[in-house]
Amino acid sequence: MQRYEQELAALARRDRLRALSPRLGADFSSNDYLALSDDPDMRRALVAALERGVPFGAGGSRLLRGNHEEHEKLETEAAAFFGTERALYFGSGYMANFALFSLLPQPDDLVVYDELVHASCHEGMRAGRARCVAVAHRDAGAVDDAIRAWRCDGGKGQAWIAVESLYSMDGDIAPLAELAAIAESHQAMLMVDEAHATGVLGLGGRGLAADYEGRDNLISLHTCGKALGAVGALVCAPKLVIDFLINRSRPFIFATAPPPLMAVAVGEALRIVQRQPERRERLQRLVAFANRELAARCGIAGSGSQILPVIVGGEARAMSLAATLQAAGYDIRGIRPPTVPEGSSRLRIALTLRVDETTTSAMIDTLAEALETLPA
């Protein structure tokens, strides 16, 4: 136990010791973009499911007795909604990404990934057997160059391209049209993590890769714990890939299946996304307002999305700014290494339907004042 004490003490000395904190103030921190996590329609769907006997827990792995009608119904509905051949429901986005990256790329393959992909992708790649190469953020040309160099070096396997469609800490968007063309030219597989776009962006909230769904070389991941307000993740892919995951993915095979009640919740969230487009429209109006106001009052160029990073560089300043905003009643968290690269500590402002323009304007006023008064 001493080594754990020593490591925690070292984190404390560097002011990087983390602790859980309560949910306080106006929500500018969560990923509940459409405010579905406690939506009345979601509640009614869950109550109705309980009344008709849907169980709390799955009772086992999907390959044993844990495969429930609700899982299969969700996967069928999700495949139709996203426009893919098949979908597979995992317990979390982390588990799904780990499953994909640890299993699918083979020893002779190459994975070219954006340097800012999620930690779960990195863990999956470390557990996998393929060669993995990072490229500069949003640099499609570097992706093409990396695959060409690998082929010139004698690479014979499958090339894989891994990106997020909307990046969780920067709020910017991957150049998917260019990447899709590069994937086609190299007969590469394109893996797109839609975690922060699902339900919010793309045609009908289907994500930013919606135009490419259904292609044999696309695998997309849609998390269910952000805009969909529930838990889990849906992997969308050709039937062959889904069948391979069912048969070979250890995180899928050896884990208790997600609660059937959560499958019901995700299914209801997808239906709400379809029948209530005004939620997305309201959010996009708030996004446009906040981006304009942030530029006008703080001199900070907005990301254009619902994720607004305020990059201040130093860790101490980021955490002081966060504390000031929290004291004023705004739940905004400071983000620092190792979550983001060294020298890019920031505030991560997330816009959700839990706030309106009035609250957002007041928050930006407080932020502008804090930026002026707190030393750089």
Stretches with model-predicted labels:
Residues 1-57, 188:
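N-terminal "arm"/small-domain region of PLP-dependent enzymes with the aminotransferase-like
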Residues 36-37, 282-288, 295-329, 343-344, ...:
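Conserved PLP-binding catalytic core of the aspartate aminotransferase-like
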Residues 40, 44-48, 52, 80, ...:
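PLP-dependent enzyme catalytic core of the Aspartate aminotransferase-like
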Residues 44, 51-92:
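Conserved N-terminal alpha-helix of the aminotransferase class I/II PLP-enzyme fold
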Residues 100-119, 140:
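Conserved PLP-anchoring active-site segment centered on the Schiff-base-forming lysine
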Residues 131-133, 137-192:
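Active-site phosphate-binding strand-loop segment of PLP-dependent enzymes
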Residues 204, 212-244:
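Active-site PLP attachment segment
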Residues 257-276, 282:
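Structural motif of enzymes handling amino- and sulfur-group chemistry
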